[in-house]
Curated annotation (Swiss-Prot):
Tagged with keyword Membrane: yes
Annotated InterPro entries: PSI_PsaJ, PSI_PsaJ_sf
Full protein name: Photosystem I reaction center subunit IX
Species for this entry: Nephroselmis olivacea (Green alga)
GO CC annotations on file: chloroplast thylakoid membrane; photosystem I
Amino acid sequence: MKDFTTYLSTAPVLAAVWFGFLAGLLIEINRFFPDALSFSFV
């Protein structure tokens, strides 16, 4: 179990989890606020 927790704390695994979380967050923000980068409300 110690080797498994060491594996989970390595940089590629943490990066994959972080980027997956960030991608999901951006997808959900874009779902609720579509075209937020176009500034069509100005």
